[in-house]
């Protein structure tokens, strides 16, 4: 039995005991989480190229946190707190392949909601499935991502999942780079939430004397440029 209970519209909400457990835990603070990311050297400045081909003056490497079970769980717990506070309703958790799979696994475990896995492409052997796991057609999926730029990876994943007769209405990420994802995803009827924003990261780097206010505004202006 999972932590999902049926509602009138066919979606599901997290069971009360799980909600209470999440709410009772000490909230993950943005500053504490930033400090852990900083210590793990997740922030790099310079010239880096994203999947989109766009150059960025700052790169956030959240893949590094999979090497720290404690920090990885902090990230998942922070997402779960956001999920519960936002009263999101869903039947399954899916990590955007493949960097978000560790996060999705922990979110599934903390909330006691089934996880599915979406392959980048269907297997050419065996069952040839694109979606791995046990699910009912018409169920609702929550997408989990680590870092979001324009939201394109989420859009691609949502489209593929919808083509498998599943619904996708919400997506959540650890970090929003604030490069248009919220508006882009809204065009596909996707509600987007995040725990951290790029501006919060830049503010944290200022407190570490790694950046000036002037440089922060230069980076924000650069990130605001259209792709």
From Swiss-Prot:
One GO process term, biological-process aspect: UMP biosynthetic process
Pathway: Pyrimidine metabolism; UMP biosynthesis via de novo pathway; UMP from orotate: step 1/2; Pyrimidine metabolism; UMP biosynthesis via salvage pathway; UMP from uracil: step 1/1
InterPro entries with a match to the protein in the record: OPRT, Or_phspho_trans_dom, PRibTrfase_dom, PRTase-like
Xref: CDD domains: PRTases_typeI
PROSITE patterns hit by this protein: PUR_PYR_PR_TRANSFER (PS00103)
Coiled-coil boundaries: none
Enzyme class: transferase
MF terms (GO), sorted A to Z: orotate phosphoribosyltransferase activity; orotidine-5'-phosphate decarboxylase activity; uracil phosphoribosyltransferase activity
Keywords: Glycosyltransferase, Pyrimidine biosynthesis, Transferase
Record-listed E.C. numbers: 2.4.2.10, 2.4.2.9
Positions bound to orotate: 149, 177
Superkingdom in the source lineage: Eukaryota
Tissue: Expressed in body wall muscles, spermatheca and vulva muscles.
Reaction catalysis annotation: orotidine 5'-phosphate + diphosphate = orotate + 5-phospho-alpha-D-ribose 1-diphosphate; UMP + diphosphate = 5-phospho-alpha-D-ribose 1-diphosphate + uracil
Pfam families for the chain: Pribosyltran
Binding-site residues, 5-phospho-alpha-D-ribose 1-diphosphate: 51, 119-120, 123
Record text on subunit structure and interactions: Homodimer.
Function: Phosphoribosyltransferase which catalyzes the formation of UMP from uracil in vitro and thus may be involved in UMP biosynthesis via the salvage pathway. May also participate in the first step of UMP synthesis by catalyzing the formation of orotidine 5'-phosphate, a UMP precursor, from orotate.
Family: Belongs to the purine/pyrimidine phosphoribosyltransferase family. PyrE subfamily.
Protein name: Orotate phosphoribosyltransferase
UniProt organism field: Caenorhabditis elegans
